[in-house]
Swiss-Prot record:
Subcellular location: Secreted, Extracellular space
Signal recorded as keyword: yes
Chain's gene name: Acp26Ab
Residues annotated as signal peptide: 1-21
InterPro entries, per database record: Acp26Ab
Predominant location category: secreted
Lineage: Eukaryota, Metazoa, Ecdysozoa, Arthropoda, Hexapoda
Function: This protein is transferred from male to female during mating and may affect egglaying and behavior after mating.
Keywords (A to Z) from UniProt: Behavior, Secreted, Signal
GO cellular component: extracellular region
Tissue: Main cells of the accessory glands of males.
Protein name per UniProt: Accessory gland-specific peptide 26Ab
Organism: Drosophila sechellia (Fruit fly)
GO terms under biological process: mating behavior; sexual reproduction
Length: 90
């Protein structure tokens, strides 16, 4: 068998394998919520949070990314940190 025939067979096999690739998947989601209230004549933020999720398979493996943020003018720093930790575990 000559090298040209082997090269043609190899090329056909490679094209056949690469044509069976799975489709690219990308899903993104985000949500945000805020509540404010006037307390002692000042507008205070009771809570302000945002959550972003992203799932894609750009590298061939599903990758899930989760980002969240939380702020409040009326909660103590310890309470804020506890809520942030709970949001990051979700």
């Amino acid at each position: 068998m000559n090298y040209f025939a082997v090269l043609c067979i190899f090329s056909c096999i490679c094209l056949w394998q690469f044509s069976d690739a799975a489709p690219f998947i990308s899903v993104q989601s985000s949500s945000q919520s805020r509540s404010q209230k006037v307390m002692n004549g000042m507008l205070r933020t009771l809570y302000d949070y945002s959550v972003q999720d992203s799932v894609n398979d750009a590298t061939g493996h599903l990758i899930h990314t989760h980002k969240s943020n939380f702020n409040s003018d009326v909660m103590s720093p310890e309470e804020i940190e506890r809520v942030r930790q709970q949001l990051n575990m979700a």
